[in-house]
Each structure stands twice: as structure tokens, then as C-alpha cells.
Amino acid sequence: MTNKSNSFIENKTQLIQYFKDGIKKDTDLKIGVEHEKFLFNKTDLKRINYDQIKKIFEILKEKGWEPQLEKDKLIGLKRQNQKITTEPGFQYELSGAPFKNIHSVCSENSSHFNELKEVFKSTNITTSSIAYDPFNKLTDIPKNPKERYTIMTAEMPKGGKLSLDMMYKTAGIQINYDYTSEEDFEKKFKIGNYLAPLTIALFANSPFNENKLSGFLSYRGKVWQETNRGGIMSITFENINFEKYIDHAINYPILFLKKNGKYHTPNGQTFRDFLNGNLSFLKGEKPTLEDFENHLGTIFTEIRLKQVIEFRSLDTCNFGCICNGPSFFTGLIYGSLEETYEIIKNWKKEEVMEAYLNAPKQGLNTLLQDKKLIDWAKIFLDISKKGLDKRNELNKSGKNETIYLKHIEEIISNKKTRAEMLIEQYNKTKKLDFLINHDENFSYSGF
């Protein structure tokens, strides 16, 4: 196995090989889900601080989780292929293990959040399954002591006016998919990007900001559109391969660089500069594969490539709908790839981008190719169901992965997103106390 921290990059061929090393066989395709949650103090709904997350981690350590440290500070946990980390404002994130089917993904989430619920019983902490902090001002949110976040807090606002809102006030769901070839990567990458407007609209769950309506159904979606290094990559609408993705990625400025245990800010110099040995503070030194991998993780676009394809446009939601997004896209990506790609492949950049920018506010009423997104939702839901039926991944009760599409079916049937239902509740009392999930049910319904 390549030691990424000691493997210096001498030419672009090594970077292309990095992505080729991510290619999987058709029989080895997995699904990985990362899910973020806000944690609040029960008494005043202020966001938790480092001492409180540390207490949670200390309790979880007793359940077999291994501590992850940075300069003697407990910053995360690991157990087998699962990781727990926190975002800049202590949003709690479970990065799940890669699994063959949605049943296993959902079971993992259920198991962990029940574990977390037990922890909450001995603390003054509760959760809210919403994608944008509805209660707190940006300036009131405690800051995570991770060094990289300190650098990002200083650097990110230079290129996007809502970058700090993204860092501290949003919570999302990310789905990771494998690819079987360069051509397969291109199709999945395009599908994810072209369907970003639909994803934002269908999973909209963030209509509030500072205890009032924000004017958006997915304010998280709006924030990510105005974030440094965010949005939809321009190369999406061209013929793409690994080399083109690399050429695009290395033109981003390096956000931070860790060398010899110390973080550096290269002040606008790009990864291409680094490849050419032209970093001002590391003159003549070349990057390692680890440096490249870290750089890829600081590109915050809707769809992103590492050695998996990351779908990143979904608002987080309550446990009942966490498995909906992964099941929906698994049906399209793994079950009905060709049919899905045939529909979107000739969509024009201008049409997609207009729908993308309108979706956070207009939701399923957004127009794309002269159809409302709710009509596209019906079309792609049917295709997803066919794909999941074709996969025929069964649980212990003999049911396939279509059982997790209920949330989407209800949205389409009612012609209302979760955000619109939350707005209706808010309009009855002009209060947001219903958003707190003191007794959220984390039962796994797939058995």
C-alpha cells in the first residue's frame, strides 16, 4: 500500500493513477453516508461547546470508540470503519462505514443514534434534525479548536460572503458512491450535478434563520451557493475525465497545508504552484499524495471526487428520512445509471444553473427544461424504484430498498417539502420549539 505522506508527486500521471486506484469492480460497489446533526443545550437552545462535546466523546469511549487527538485535545472518535467528528461549530457528524446496501447503512445510523440518545440522558443536550441552525446568531456559536478550522475561519470569507454561515450554521447529508471506470465516473458526476436543483428542492429542510422565516425552503442550499470554493464546477458541462478534474482541482488556492506537524496558509498560491515546486515557504518541495488528498477535501462543490464520488446537496433531516436520499440516488446511480444518464445528458448549462440558483427559494416549483421539479421528482422516483427493484437487495423480512422511499413519496403526493410543512407549523404559533427532537425515534424500520 502506498504511504501517502511519503509519496512525493513528480508528475500528473501519479494524480491520474490516484483516481484510477479508486476504480471498483461492479460486484464491489458500496454506499457510504455521512450525516450531520446540531446539538443544543436543552435549557436555552444555545449550541454546545468543546467541553460538552468532549464529555459526549468520553462517554462514547466507554462503548468501544477510540479517541482521536490533535495536540492532546480530543477532537473525534473512531470504531472500525466508522468515524465521529465535529464541524467548525460542533455540528456532530457520523461518517459511516461503506456498505453494500441501504439496509446496512440505515441499520448503522439507527444503532449509533440510539447510542447517542442514551448519552444525552446524562447530559443537558438535545438535537434538532434541521439543516440550518434556526436559533443562534453566527457570532454566538462556540468555535471548534481544530487548527484547520481556525485557518478556514480567517480564509473562507475572502471568496464567499456566506462562507462562515456554511461552516458554523449548516448540517447536511453526504452520500459516497464508487465508480467502475473513467466513463462511469463521468456519468455519475454529471447526474449528481445536473440533479443538484432537484436534490436541493426535494430534501429542503432549512427554512428558518434566527427564529424567523428566512424566505428560503433550503437556506442551507442558498448558503452553500454563496460559499468560497462552492457551487457546481464549470467542467461539469464539458466532457470530463480524471485529468480534466485534476486540472480544475489544482487551480484552486491551497486553503491550508500541514507540514512537520504545523499548519501553513499559502496566501492564495494554488496546488499547481505546489506541483511546480513554487510555494514561497517550501521552495523546491513537491507535494505528497496526502497533500493532494487534503486539498481535494477543501473543495466544497455540490459534487466532489476523491476515490469516491461525493453527493453533497442534501439538507440533513430527521431519522425517518435519513435513508431516503441514499436509497433514491442508489436506485439511480447503481440500479438505473444508463436510463438516468440518457435523460440528463443533453441538458444545457444555462438551464441547470438557473434551476440550481432558484431551487433553494422556489423548491419543487422551480422550472427545469420546461418542467417543474416536482414533475422531474416523479420521473426520477419511478426510475429509482426500478433500479432498486433490479438490485433486489433484501433485508431479513425479504423487503428490498424501495421501503426507504416513503418520505419522497409523501412529498410528491402532498406536493409539499419538509420545509413547507415546517413553515405551516411555525405559522400557527410563530414559535420554533417544535424543532427540538427530545424524543426522536431512531428505530430501524428495515427488519
Predicted feature descriptions by range:
Residues V223, N228-Y252, V352-K415:
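C-terminal, helix-dominated tail/subdomain
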Residues M1-K161, K169, A204, C321, ...:
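Terminal catalytic/cofactor-binding subdomain
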Residues T270-V352:
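Long, well-ordered mid-to-C-terminal structural blocks that present hydrophobic/aromatic surfaces
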Residues G96, Y177-Y179, S313:
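Short glycine-centered, acidic/aromatic-flanked micro-motifs in structured strand/loop junctions
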Residues S104, T180, D184, L314-I322:
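Conserved phosphate-binding loops in nucleotide/dinucleotide-binding enzymes
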Residues K121, T127-S128, Y132-R304:
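Loop-rich catalytic cores of soluble enzymes, especially ATP-dependent carboxylate-amine ligases
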Residues F38, Q174-N176, E310-R312:
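Structured core elements
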